[in-house]
Swiss-Prot record:
Organism of provenance: Bacillus subtilis (strain 168)
Name of the protein: Uncharacterized amino acid permease YecA
PANTHER family in the record: AMINO ACID TRANSPORTER-RELATED, L-METHIONINE_BRANCHED-CHAIN AMINO ACID EXPORTER YJEH
UniProt-annotated location(s): Cell membrane
Major subcellular site: membrane
Highest taxon in the source lineage: Bacteria
């Protein structure tokens, strides 16, 4: 029998990892940005997108019960269609996380410049340190990594709940009138931005083989995390609108202004701490899920089998993590040397993420029956993702190029069929 990933994750740790994967730095700026664009109506959009996120979560929860695999969403597509389809989706994902995660790290590190006059190279160094710490923790094993994630998420939730609580007394009903100052078109325009605040659920599914009871614990983790994330987003949007903490200052200043109404001048420092904690939690969870997905692809022979090795002592995909560290370094170096705009860098990975959701929902429509509530959730999510994907512009080509590269690789290599020794 081939060695397996170590089963050590509980539903508590799974919930923390899931929250970390979804709750990005967008929570620090989007409530104010969307309120500035759509007014109080932005709160309605946050509620609607929170509801839509349960469609995605419900579908993933059903799929995990069918195939609790380290392949995650690639395993579901493979099961629904064929091995090549799952492998091609895996190649699409190869072009998302390795670029997206360093961008997240840079975004979080950028917030430090609001309390210090950090130079660009210092911001890049801070981002690199966060990535390096996360990689090293994952190399030490999923148990330690999950415990750290749980601790960080507890700190984040405490700070956010405290910020909301101290702001509630300053909420006034008058700030919610008029509800639609810029019309429904403005409310619709912010929906795409808000949608990206609810992506990342799929990153917990590749950890299924490391849960004690994946069929029960993964769905529980997904639904608890979805409830927590939705509650935080909606309440933060509510107090942002109700205290009119938007439209007057820059991105981070809006949240700092909100927190300062209850916490005084320390608001900006609390905000920066939140930014760093949230950034680390996000990159940590994404590295966890993605490294297992790549390991599973190598295990199946869909990418070079060199990456299908586990550490003999920690049962972690050590070679994948090392390769990720190298790619992260290249992305940071490219950004530092050529000053590539982060928004431009993010367009490709964003399109790849949406494409992965479309493929996953299509797989669910085939695997689940129409009498299953998960089928209807998948249908709603499929339609929503397809519409959003159509607005990706030139980035539409990015997933297509990655898919073509994967198809070419499998065509030339023919897929490795030999059995592997999965332990170093």
């Amino acid at each position: 029998m081939l060695p397996e990933l170590q089963r050590s994750i509980t539903w508590i740790q799974g919930t923390a990892l899931t929250i970390g994967a979804v709750l990005g730095c967008g929570i620090l700026i989007l409530p104010s940005v969307t309120a500035d664009t759509a007014g109080p109506a932005s709160l309605f959009v946050w509620v609607f997108m929170s509801f839509l996120s349960f469609f995605l979560v419900g579908t993933l929860a059903r799929l995990v019960k069918i195939a609790p695999s380290a392949g995650g969403i690639t395993a579901y597509v493979q099961l629904a269609f064929q091995k090549k389809a799952g492998a091609i989706l895996g190649w699409i994902m190869l072009g998302s996380v390795p670029i997206g995660v360093p961008i997240i790290a840079l975004t979080g590190a950028h917030y430090v410049s609001y309390i210090t006059e950090a130079a660009d190279w210092q911001i890049t160094l801070i981002a690199g340190c966060m990535l390096a710490i996360s990689i090293l923790l994952h190399m030490r094993g999923i148990q330690l990594s999950a415990n750290i994630s749980t601790l960080v998420i507890c700190v984040i939730v405490f700070l956010l709940v405290t910020s909301i609580a101290v702001s509630l007394p300053h909420v006034t009903i008058a700030e919610f009138k008029p509800f639609l100052p810029h019309g429904w078109s403005a409310a619709g325009s912010v929906s795409v931005m808000i949608f990206f605040s609810f992506v990342g659920w799929e990153m917990i599914t590749p950890l299924a083989e490391e849960f004690h009871r994946p069929e029960k614990d993964v769905p529980l983790s997904l639904f608890l995390a979805a409830s927590c994330v939705a509650g935080l987003y909606i309440m933060l949007s509510f107090v942002t609108v109700g205290t009119h903490s938007y439209g007057e200052n820059g991105e981070i200043a809006s949240l700092a202004m909100l927190i300062s109404k209850g916490a005084g001048e320390s608001g900006v420092y609390v905000t920066v701490c939140l930014a760093l904690f949230i950034t680390f939690a996000t990159i940590h969870a994404n590295i966890a899920g993605f490294s297992r997905m790549v390991y599973a692809l190598a295990r199946e022979g869909h990418i070079p089998v060199f990456f299908g090795k586990l550490s003999a002592t920690k049962r972690t995909p050590i070679r994948v993590l090392t390769a990720m560290a190298a790619v992260f370094g290249l992305v940071l170096a490219a950004h530092g040397l050529f000053q590539i705009d982060l928004t431009t860098l993010l367009k490709g990975p964003s399109a790849a993420f949406i494409a992965s959701y479309i493929c996953t929902m299509a797989a669910a429509l085939k695997l689940l029956g129409r009498r299953d509530i998960g089928w209807w959730m998948a249908l709603g999510a499929f339609v929503a993702c397809a519409v959003i994907y159509s607005f990706s512009g030139w980035a539409l080509l990015y997933p297509a190029v990655l898919a073509a590269a994967g198809y070419f690789y499998m065509k030339t290599k023919g897929g490795h069929k030999k059995k592997l020794d999965h332990v170093l």
